[in-house]
Curated annotation (Swiss-Prot):
GO terms for molecular function: thiazole synthase activity. This is Thiazole synthase. Catalyzes the rearrangement of 1-deoxy-D-xylulose 5-phosphate (DXP) to produce the thiazole phosphate moiety of thiamine. Sulfur is provided by the thiocarboxylate moiety of the carrier protein ThiS. In vitro, sulfur can be provided by H(2)S. It is found in: Cytoplasm. GO terms for cellular component: cytoplasm. It comes from Aliivibrio salmonicida (strain LFI1238) (Vibrio salmonicida (strain LFI1238)). Its EC number is 2.8.1.10. GO terms for biological process: thiamine diphosphate biosynthetic process. Keywords: Cytoplasm, Schiff base, Thiamine biosynthesis, Transferase. Homotetramer. Forms heterodimers with either ThiH or ThiS. InterPro entries: Aldolase_TIM, Thiazole_synthase_ThiG, ThiG. Belongs to the ThiG family. Pathway: Cofactor biosynthesis; thiamine diphosphate biosynthesis.
Length: 256
């Protein structure tokens, strides 16, 4: 049994957060989210009609009892992100926000300057801000200092499925963070998610690897188990890596 995750005084028993894009249909999306055990699902504000409770994305999440994490994907600067956040809060009655600002549509790299600027203002306005950002230890510390409830550094570019290519920087971020660290983007296999948890990440967010799988519902189960396994291993002390062989049995001669 692992310890619960706390973000902004809200407890989560699952450390797997999920996205809602790229699923074949809304029913499969709902089934996968439920099977994943996730308690927090993010959705792009540009893809939903927040004023319509029957929306194909919004309704399945809400009827499944999963908490909403609106995101500002598509915003190109702080001004656009703040405007989108204000609309979401009014329509959905939530202060929770995944802040995403990526002006380049080809690589979807988060803009660090605009993200920090928007985060500071949104925190001032009372939002619970979870910013998607580069795996930059200095930036993550600055985001923490302006009041973000967690930081969400990337493991690899969005949708790349490359896994944890930013390991060295993630380890620094995790080591110095005083808020939860949620590894977001690039996680393409359950083993990637388990590895992120073994490094000490507090949670992971997975979308493409579940939604685009041949069987998204079964893949959601695989990720649920991987996250649980990785966190359990981290909490109970992984053995250190050695460049030499270390015997597990006595080294005395066989006939002694």
């Amino acid at each position: 049994m692992t310890q619960p995750l706390i973000i902004a005084n809200t407890p989560f028993s699952s450390r797997l957060f999920t996205g809602t894009g790229k699923f074949p249909n809304s029913l499969i999306m709902q089934q996968a989210l439920i099977e994943s055990g996730s308690e927090l699902a993010t959705m792009a504000l540009k893809r939903v009609d927040v004023s319509n409770p029957e929306d194909d994305i919004l309704k399945p999440i809400m009827t499944a009892g999963i908490n909403l994490l609106p995101n500002t994907s598509g915003a190109k600067n702080a001004r656009e992100a703040i405007f989108a956040a204000q609309l979401a809060r009014e329509a959905l009655q939530t202060n929770w926000l995944k802040l995403e600002i990526h002006p380049d549509p080809k690589y979807l790299m988060p803009d660090p300057i605009e993200t920090l600027k928007a985060a500071e203002e949104l925190v001032r306005q009372g939002f619970i801000v979870l910013p998607y950002c580069h795996a930059d230890p200095v930036l993550c510390k600055r985001l923490e200092e302006v009041g973000c409830a967690a930081v969400m550094p990337l493991g690899a570019p969005i949708g790349s499925n490359k896994g944890i290519v930013s390991r060295d920087f993630l380890e620094i971020i995790i080591d110095q963070a005083k808020v939860p660290v949620v590894v977001d983007a690039g996680i393409g296999a359950p083993s990637h998610a388990a590895f992120a948890m073994e490094l000490g990440a507090d949670a992971v967010l997975v979308n493409t690897a579940i939604a685009a799988a041949r069987n998204p519902v079964a893949m959601a189960t695989a990720f649920k188990l991987a996250v649980q396994s990785g966190r359990l291993a981290y909490e109970n002390g992984l053995v250190s890596v050695s460049s030499q062989a270390v015997a597990s049995s006595p080294l005395t001669a066989f006939l002694d």
